[in-house]
């Protein structure tokens, strides 16, 4: 569901706000996402497919960035095997369920505390 600049996905364990790269939600190959968890914390992740990474490296070979495309890096990177928000949401479901999101995603807002 589109909400301004963001594409929203709601699941029982999280709400994800995707800032999509180039392309529609069905075929986008990279996106930044804020994941709002049920404990009140918010984590940040970046999704890429391998072809999207290859395009970045090719552009960097041409531009001379990163020593002519010698490497690629992105903070909080999750590589997915296929494009689309649906594939990203499936990955998020597993990351949240397994608690791997705590290691993978940067914490940008901590758990909300109830001070009574």
Residue locations for each model-derived region?
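Short helix/strand-capping turn motifs
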Residues: 2-101
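C-terminal charged interaction modules
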Residues: 93-116
């Amino acid at each position: 569901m589109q909400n301004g600049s963001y594409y929203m996905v709601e699941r029982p364990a999280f709400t994800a706000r995707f800032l999509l790269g180039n392309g529609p939600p069905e075929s986008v190959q990279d996106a930044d996402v804020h994941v709002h968890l049920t404990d009140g914390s918010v984590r940040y992740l970046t999704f890429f497919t391998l072809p999207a990474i290859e395009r970045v490296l090719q552009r960097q070979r041409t531009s001379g960035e990163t020593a002519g495309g010698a490497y690629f890096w992105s903070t909080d990177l999750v590589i997915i095997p296929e494009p689309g928000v649906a594939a990203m949401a499936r990955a998020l479901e597993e990351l949240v369920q397994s608690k791997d999101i705590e290691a993978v995603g940067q914490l940008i807002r901590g758990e909300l505390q109830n001070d009574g």
